[in-house]
Amino acid sequence: MAVPAKKRKMNFSEREVEIIVEELELKKHLLVNHFNAGVPLAAKSAAWHGILRRVNAVATCRRELPEVKKKWSDLKTEVRRKVAQVRAAVEGGEAPGPTEDDGAGGPGTGSGSGGSGTAIAPVLLTPMQQRICNLLGEATIISLPSTTEIHPVALGSTATTAAATVTLTQIPTETTYHTLEEGVVEYCTAEAPPPLPTEAPVEMIAQPPDTSVKPQALKSRIALNSAKLIQEQRVTNLHIKEIAQHLEQQNGLLQMIRRSQEVQACAQERQAQAMEGTQAALSVLIQVLRPMIKDFRRYLQNNTPNPAPASAPGPVAQNGQPDSIIQ
């Protein structure tokens, strides 16, 4: 008997992926590795089941929890691979190369102080990948588009032994920078202006520049450093929030201690007032009882009978018998 083929489920839609990323952004303190220190497994499992319910609410076919976790793992792997390509290109001093998903590969022209070469299309992240990158805490670089040109200004070669000829690189004056999301830096450039005239050579006394570093690599390094600084600032802000929460807890404890001390002080005041009232009542009672005690003593003294005097004994005979008997 032939085994029936297993029906393959449809791929995750954009809406499902958006829900997964949105829920993970809301529950990052439970599910993201560098946020969920000390979170119990039961809380993590409940959070994943909540994400699964939201995904199944919009999905065309029923999803299982391992499928959702596998999709999130694939999204993280793809974003980390692109960021690794950018870092490798920055460390190697070359522009980031194209990827299979970008579809932006193509030849270009570029120039550097060390020689001539071909510029490769930069690695670009989609807005969803940028959100995932920020969620993972990776330093993101969005390189300049391939249409941006760098205009070198050739200076005169006449110089003395103490002077060095400096090649100036013109950056478009209308370049602006803005932040898409926290930790993501994007470069937006307008049309490149025409190159400066090269008629008048300029001589400057300076140290010979490092010709091995390309301008594009310098820009990429600056962007990487800025992204790292932003990430460090985010971590610092988290520490500051934790310290603030700790201080708030301590303030709450201090307020509770103060309230208990106030309650104890009120109780002591009430006890002191009660003691004073008792003492006043006793003093009044003593003052009332004193005349009564005096009157009672007088009464006892007046009503007590005086004892009768003892009778004188009769004459006793010499032999010890009374005289009446003798007579």
Swiss-Prot record:
GO cellular component: cytosol; mitochondrion; nucleoplasm; nucleus; plasma membrane
Biased composition (Gly residues): 104-117
Region listing for Disordered, in residue ranges: 87-118, 301-327
Keywords noted in UniProt: Apoptosis, Nucleus
GO biological process, one term: regulation of mitochondrial membrane permeability involved in apoptotic process
Region (Required for nuclear localization and apoptosis-inducing activity) residue spans: 1-70
Residue ranges, compositional bias (Polar residues): 318-327
Compartment annotation: Nucleus
Pfam family, one: Myb_DNA-bind_5
Record function comment: Induces apoptosis.
PANTHER family on file: AGAP001331-PA-RELATED (PTHR23098), NUCLEAR APOPTOSIS-INDUCING FACTOR 1 (PTHR23098:SF7)
Record family assignment: Belongs to the NAIF1 family.
Assembly behavior: Interacts with HARBI1.
Protein name: Nuclear apoptosis-inducing factor 1
Taxonomic source organism: Mus musculus
